[in-house]
């Protein structure tokens, strides 16, 4: 497959100077590291031959830490100090984390939730760094040298806060992040090289804790993500919880000790995985009070439990297709990613929706890491002939800024391919204005109050001018990792201010879904609200300019004219607070009509003043 290259700045190394770079799939349930060896991507195993590293960290009294399989085996015995599925808490607040029902003690802290352990309060970034450090050491042991960097995969629906948290975890682990790569895109790289196929593809990624659906167009080596969707709080863990609720019907599971709840989830996962190949599976747990919970779960029962969860993923898939302007029949194939896609009920329902057998010839647990390894190899400069491609990911929600009246000016629309930079010019609202506040927002609605605030900063040092004369260019840049920076620059002086957007915590899936749904259902009311705000802003501008003109040249009006203008001016000032767009428009028009002759007289005076004392030949 002939592909095009987007490469990082810098000189290309000589052929013999091969640099070691890896791809890392930092997963909710398991994590992996892969590298390209002898031009072939492969997942790297530990000393025991295991390629999957359970994403589990246990903190012991005295400072010792257990990571991976050893920690996983001890989670039922020490649940509060054994952190699993930490990816769910990346970039989240304490309220978000507590709502997940996870059996931990959450501590709210500035910026991000922390988890209380015997070694103190730890952030998800610190826990994730422990997992990444093990993978880094494994790679260096297997490859025999230090790494120049890593490509780390993230769910496509991760927002700025969650992506930044992932980067921070990598830095703590001593890793140089070459790029954050969306998991579906990584899978497309792996499958694209094997299949050499063009057309529309869906990547269905159901992991331990997150779900992503991406619609990609593959054309002559260009991987373009044309729409994304998903659920950052839905994965295999939720199927396990459904099994527990079924097996423990009549039992108040939430009231059980943490260790019992963890043991129930472990048994549920074992049953779910057994049902992949068997018609039924046992569910047996002995609680700490000696009671035994025993049940036999059939595949038919499990499919009934799983149906609403799988249905949520299919709803996301339909929304992504609508966003891309495509029908189900336009999709040529479906790539399955994530260990949870091994469930027969998932494969059956996905196949039924798209009318085609899902692609499963690559290990769904490994495909993301393999694609990340290929991308890391390229970014490190180790490319061979024909090993280049162009990656085009998209942003999930529109980015914009607040304008007068609390309106949103959309700068980068959702589903724009990244990296992307867009700029727009704005001006001042008042005469002599020397500063401007820039409020960056995210969302699909027309009013700032209905969108999510991302950042605020001020541009100072604007030269005093009449309103509307200054030119301020605001530039939005989203890099290849999906991280946003905003710059405001006054054009005549070059004075500049900027901000790198790092929200305090991420959007929940419910918030994302609500923002997208509201943009459709509230479209008419948003349009009416926008018209009203725009008319109110126009009224305010006219009232201020007429007031300034009267103060400067009020003597140009006779008493009757002045009385009329004052009356219309007062009416327009009062109209600014009205909720009737037609009433505001009428008041603006009335004031404009009343001051038309006044404006002409002011212009005449200005011209006479400019020409006073000057000779005709001086004007030639």
UniProtKB/Swiss-Prot annotation:
Known function: Chaperone involved in the maturation of iron-sulfur cluster-containing proteins. Has a low intrinsic ATPase activity which is markedly stimulated by HscB.
One biological process term in Gene Ontology: iron-sulfur cluster assembly
Organism: Bordetella pertussis (strain Tohama I / ATCC BAA-589 / NCTC 13251)
Lineage: Bacteria, Pseudomonadati, Pseudomonadota, Betaproteobacteria, Burkholderiales
Similarity comment text for this entry: Belongs to the heat shock protein 70 family.
One Pfam short name: HSP70
Gene encoding the protein: hscA
Name of the protein described by the UniProt record: Chaperone protein HscA homolog
PANTHER family found in the cross-reference section: HEAT SHOCK PROTEIN 70KDA
InterPro entries assigned to the protein according to its UniProt record, in alphabetical order: ATPase_NBD, Heat_shock_70_CS, HSP70_C_sf, HSP70_peptide-bd_sf, Hsp_70_fam, ISC_FeS_clus_asmbl_HscA
Superkingdom of this protein's organism: Bacteria
GO molecular function terms listed in the Swiss-Prot or TrEMBL record: ATP binding; ATP hydrolysis activity; ATP-dependent protein folding chaperone; unfolded protein binding
Keywords: ATP-binding, Chaperone, Nucleotide-binding
């Amino acid at each position: 497959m002939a592909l095009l290259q987007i490469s990082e700045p810098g000189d290309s190394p000589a052929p013999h100077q091969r640099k070691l770079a890896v791809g890392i799939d930092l997963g909710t349930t398991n994590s992996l590291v892969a590298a390209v060896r002898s031009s072939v991507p492969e997942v790297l195993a530990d000393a025991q031959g295991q390629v999957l590293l359970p994403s589990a960290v246990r903190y012991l009294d005295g400072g010792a830490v257990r990571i991976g399989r050893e920690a996983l085996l001890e989670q039922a015995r020490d649940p509060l100090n054994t952190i699993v599925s930490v990816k769910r808490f990346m970039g989240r607040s304490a309220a978000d984390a507590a709502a997940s029902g996870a059996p931990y003690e959450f501590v709210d802290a500035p910026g991000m939730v922390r988890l209380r352990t015997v070694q103190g309060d730890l952030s998800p970034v610190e826990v994730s760094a422990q997992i990444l450090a093990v993978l880094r050491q494994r790679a260096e042991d297997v490859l025999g040298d230090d790494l120049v960097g890593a490509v780390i995969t993230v769910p496509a629906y991760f927002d700025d806060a969650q992506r930044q948290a992932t980067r921070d975890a990598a830095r703590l682990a001593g890793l140089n992040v070459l790029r954050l790569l969306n998991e579906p895109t990584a899978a497309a790289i792996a499958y694209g090289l094997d299949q050499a196929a063009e057309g529309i593809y869906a990547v269905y990624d159901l992991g331990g804790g997150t779900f992503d659906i991406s619609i990609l167009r593959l054309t002559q080596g260009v991987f373009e993500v044309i729409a994304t969707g998903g659920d950052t709080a839905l994965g295999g863990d939720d199927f396990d919880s459904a099994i527990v609720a079924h097996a423990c019907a009549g039992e108040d599971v939430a009231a059980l000790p943490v260790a019992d709840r963890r043991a129930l989830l472990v048994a549920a996962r074992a049953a779910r995985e057994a049902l992949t190949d068997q018609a039924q599976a046992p569910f047996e747990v002995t609680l700490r009070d000696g009671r035994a919970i025993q049940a036999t779960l059939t595949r038919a029962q499990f499919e009934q439990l799983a149906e609403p969860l799988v249905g949520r993923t299919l709803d996301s898939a339909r929304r992504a297709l609508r966003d891309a302007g495509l029908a189900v029949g336009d999709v040529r194939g479906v790539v399955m990613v994530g260990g949870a896609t091994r469930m027969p009920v998932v494969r059956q329902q996905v196949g039924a929706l798209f009318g085609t057998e899902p692609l499963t010839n690559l290990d769904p647990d490994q495909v993301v890491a393999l694609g990340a390894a290929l991308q890391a190899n390229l970014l490190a400069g180790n490319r061979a002939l024909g090993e280049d491609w162009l990656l085009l990911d998209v942003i999930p929600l529109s980015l914009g800024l607040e304008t007068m009246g609390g309106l949103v000016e959309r700068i980068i629309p959702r589903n724009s391919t990244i990296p992307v930079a867009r700029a727009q010019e704005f001006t001042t609202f008042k005469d002599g204005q020397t500063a401007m506040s820039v409020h960056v927002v995210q969302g699909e609605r027309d009013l700032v109050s209905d969108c999510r605030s991302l950042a605020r900063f001020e541009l100072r040092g604007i030269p005093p001018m009449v309103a509307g004369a200054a030119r301020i260019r605001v530039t939005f840049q989203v890099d290849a990792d999906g991280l946003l920076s905003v710059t405001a620059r006054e054009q005549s002086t070059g004075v500049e201010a900027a901000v790198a957007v790092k929200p305090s915590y991420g959007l929940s899936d419910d918030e994302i879904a609500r923002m997208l749904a509201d943009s459709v259902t509230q479209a008419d009311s948003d349009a009416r609200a926008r018209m009203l705000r725009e008319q109110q802003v126009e009224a305010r501008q006219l009232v201020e300019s007429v007031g300034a003109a009267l103060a400067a040249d009020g003597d140009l009006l006779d008493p009757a004219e002045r009385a009329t203008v004052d009356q219309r001016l007062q009416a327009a000032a009062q109209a600014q607070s009205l909720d009737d767009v037609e009433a505001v428009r009428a008041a603006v028009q009335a004031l404009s009509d009343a001051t038309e002759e006044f404006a002409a007289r002011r212009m005449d005076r200005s011209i006479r003043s400019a020409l006073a004392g000057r000779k005709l030949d001086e004007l030639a």
